[in-house]
Amino acid sequence: LAIERMLGHASGMIGLPLRLLAREVYDRVVAAKGEAAAALITGEEKIAPENARYFICTVEAMPLDRAVEFLAVDEIQVARDLDRGHVFTDRLLHARGFGETMLLGSDTMRPMVRKLLPDAEIVRRERMSTLAYAGARKITKLPKRSAVVAFSAEEVYAIAELLRRHRGGAAVVMGALSPRTRNAQVKLYQDGEVDFLVATDAIGMGLNMDV
């Protein structure tokens, strides 16, 4: 919704929690508006055409000195995080579009948003899918198009190697990878060249994967 709202304005900026998600959104904006209209700004990548009108950024990299008609910040509940929370809190307090501002996140942020912005319109949207416990499974017996979430780089690589030995292939997605490598790994999985994805829990922050 935020992307469509942004593209309905003459200029816009969106702050996202993950570099990989920023790249995904950037590709969508380029497809809709062309390369000259879109900028990608993260801690690792900067693609900034001179006359760009839409800025897709990680939250930390948002150029707040630039006035835009529409501004959105995604996953504002990260304001509670001990490491990154101060940045999200600053954006929640100060980042605004001069025509429209959209703050997206967990319903747990409703009381805080209501206190800070008493006139804000709060819209609750139901999740498009449900999460269900399927029981214990051996990793080597998982069905194709499965994603495995691990919580350290060592576990990610170990599980990916296990899947490669027994099932033929797995893509790896972690924040520690270079942008080019991350994007290539996502493409491998999305294009069906491998049937398994092994990632850190960061994929739960809005990445759209065909799992």
Locations of the language-model features?
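Helicase motor core with emphasis on the C-terminal RecA-like subdomain
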Residues: 1-73, 77-211
